[in-house]
Regions:
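Extended, charged alpha-helical coiled-coil/arm scaffolds that mediate oligomerization and mechanical coupling
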Residues: 1-106
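Conserved C-terminal "switch" segment of AAA+ ATPases
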Residues: 19-28, 66-68, 180, 240-250, ...
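Walker A/P-loop
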Residues: 110-148, 177-178, 207, 211
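Short loop/turn elements that form and flank the Walker-type P-loop nucleotide-binding site
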Residues: 113-116, 139, 158, 166, ...
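Hydrophobic positions in the central parallel beta-sheet of the AAA+
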Residues: 118, 186-187, 236
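AAA+/P-loop NTPase substrate/partner-engagement loops
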Residues: 138-168, 175, 195, 264
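AAA+/SF3 P-loop NTPase mechanochemical coupling elements
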Residues: 179-183, 201, 218-238, 288-291, ...
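Conserved catalytic/switch belt of AAA+ P-loop NTPases
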Residues: 188-228, 250
Length: 348
């Protein structure tokens, strides 16, 4: 590659950097990287170094350093959205509404309160993970989820140094890029399920993420420059707190998610789940009616279950069998009763 072509490549990098809105120190650092690249000329290793510098620039210009969404602090609208997606969960909803009220009263003031870091703890299927998107919708914030189940290294969260081949940022920075804003609702899902060997290191990163005195200067190893996470609204989930470090628990507001009673499951199935399942199966409410007397059989096909995942699978199975009969030329209206319910329940 001749000098003209080399100069053209580095000028493209400079133009990309100039157009980006970056912290001044980070921009200076990137300019120095481009300057060193230009000095390499046609020397050995130029191609690899160009790829590294170009990839780094692509990452830093894509991050939402100064981009934030504006919060909707309307308590009535927030309550309606939370109720639309979730039955019950009164303690969680009340805590969020309390925080929104505080934000509304302190907006623009020096004493503006920090977001509570909620940790929803409960058995499988009790609605922990689905609360994150609802909260984001209520606030009109972006939503991102980071799964901790099976996470095997703190470097997965914090990234690797650019000295390593194929280095890239960690899950936190990747989530911010996906969000496109610096104040998303970030769900840290199943923080109790990281691998045992990496637990101590991962808990150390969690302390930094969740501590308001530290997260304004969170440094990813790949970026090698601090990113302010203080505006992120973190929500964590876990099946229990046994495997969560005390230092992490100290920074969380633990909310226990109770098991659903049969009565609550029936209400959830009627109000939330059945309309959704019918729509996803291409059916309408005219296609299916269900006798009140058989709902207990639908919500408990295998005995007691704390969550609602089995219930959702059961309704999916019912809808699938009905859809098959309609497409096969059968009736278009079905009424489930004690006499025929066994024909539509899935075979477990």
């Amino acid at each position: 590659m001749d000098n003209a072509a080399l100069n053209q490549e580095t000028e493209k990098l400079k133009a990309k950097l100039t157009a980006a809105e970056l912290p001044a120190e980070l921009k200076t650092k990137a300019e120095e990287m481009i300057g060193r690249l230009a000095l390499m000329g046609e020397g050995q290793g130029y191609s690899n170094e160009y790829d590294r510098v170009s990839q780094y620039l692509n990452w830093i210009v894509a991050l939402p350093w100064n981009k934030a969404t504006e919060d909707r602090l309307d308590l009535t609208a927030a309550r309606q959205i939370l109720d639309k997606h979730h039955y019950g969960m009164g303690q969680v909803k009340d805590r969020i509404l309390e925080y929104l009220a505080t934000m509304s009263l302190t907006r623009g003031k020096a004493e503006a309160g920090r977001a509570p870091i909620l940790c929803l703890v409960g058995l499988v299927g009790t609605g922990k993970t689905t609360f994150g998107p609802s909260l984001a919708e209520a606030l009109r914030r972006k939503y991102v989820r980071i799964p901790f189940g099976g996470l095997g290294s703190a470097l997965d969260l914090r990234g690797q140094s650019r000295l390593h081949p194929d280095a890239e940022p960690g899950l936190i920075i990747k989530a911010l890029k996906r969000a496109g804003s610096n104040n998303p609702v970030m769900l840290l899902d199943e923080i109790d399920r990281v691998t045992e060997g990496a637990r101590a290191d991962i808990m150390g990163v969690l302390v930094e993420l969740l501590d308001p005195e530290q997260n304004a200067q969170f440094t990813d190893h790949y970026l090698d420059y601090p990113f302010d996470l203080s505006q992120v609204l973190f929500v964590a989930t876990g099946n229990n707190t046994k495997n969560v470090a005390t230092a992490v628990l100290d920074r969380l507001e633990i909310i226990q998610m109770p098991s659903y009673t049969d009565e609550e499951k029936i209400a959830i199935a009627k109000q939330y789940m059945l309309p959704k399942v019918l729509a996803e199966s291409g059916l309408s409410q005219d296609n299916l009616t269900i006798d009140e007397s058989i709902w207990p059989k639908i919500v408990r096909p295998l005995g007691f279950d704390a969550g609602i995942r089995t219930l959702e699978r059961t309704l999916d199975g019912v809808a699938g069998k009905i859809a098959k009969e309609i497409v096969g030329g059968g009736s278009k209206q079905f009424h489930l009763t004690a006499a025929n319910i066994k024909n539509y329940l899935p075979d477990y």
